[in-house]
Amino acid sequence: MVELQELYKKTITPTLQKEFGFKSVMAVPRLEKITLNMGLGEAVADKKVIERAMDDMIKISGQKPLITYARKSEAGFKIRAGWPIGCKVTLRRDRMYEFLKRLISIAIPRIRDFRGLSPKSFDGRGNYSLGIREQIVFPEIQYDKVDAIRGMDITITTTARTDEEGRALLKAFGFPLKDESR
């Protein structure tokens, strides 16, 4: 069993159950999935950008990404419906916990000028989204072999019903959220 999964079952679940007064263990919020998304507008000019971004995504997530396509044509962005414009990966179960461990302990501390994650990035239903500007914060990506610095969006979906429950869950996992008072 994955380290964070064990932590969740043995310590986080009883703590949150007591804190929020849940009657059942199944009512305690848990992680559902983590979604990584890379929007690649520059793929319009160079089709190889998608392949290189997919290679980075495979190294980071350990799973093959799904290519996302433009839904409709947009003259302002010079794209047509059906053109590839990004890639995404959905992580669940063991891979999700492995990725979360690497994100919390390795990748986030390597972000330049990092002072904590914004507590305002919750969506109202306990899910948290964050953006990473450089994919090189992950140790799997070798700096010398990177053709371009690309960012990505990471969304952590939980079963929490409120932001407060989601915040307590992520704090218990060791997420470096800033205090709301500042």
From Swiss-Prot:
Keywords: Ribonucleoprotein, Ribosomal protein, RNA-binding, rRNA-binding, tRNA-binding. One of its GO terms (biological process) is translation. It comes from the Bacteria. Disulfide bonds: none annotated. The keyword Phosphoprotein does not apply. Gene3D superfamilies: 3.30.1440.10. Coiled coil: none annotated. GO terms for molecular function: rRNA binding; structural constituent of ribosome; tRNA binding. PROSITE patterns: RIBOSOMAL_L5. The keyword NAD does not apply. It holds the Pfam family Ribosomal_L5. GO terms for cellular component: ribonucleoprotein complex; ribosome. InterPro entries: Ribosomal_uL5, Ribosomal_uL5_bac-type, Ribosomal_uL5_C, Ribosomal_uL5_CS, Ribosomal_uL5_dom_sf, Ribosomal_uL5_N. Part of the 50S ribosomal subunit; part of the 5S rRNA/L5/L18/L25 subcomplex. Contacts the 5S rRNA and the P site tRNA. Forms a bridge to the 30S subunit in the 70S ribosome. NCBIfam families: PRK00010.1. PANTHER family: 60S RIBOSOMAL PROTEIN L11-RELATED (PTHR11994). HAMAP family: Ribosomal_uL5_B (MF_01333_B). This is one of the proteins that bind and probably mediate the attachment of the 5S RNA into the large ribosomal subunit, where it forms part of the central protuberance. In the 70S ribosome it contacts protein S13 of the 30S subunit (bridge B1b), connecting the 2 subunits; this bridge is implicated in subunit movement. Contacts the P site tRNA; the 5S rRNA and some of its associated proteins might help stabilize positioning of ribosome-bound tRNAs. Belongs to the universal ribosomal protein uL5 family. This is Large ribosomal subunit protein uL5.
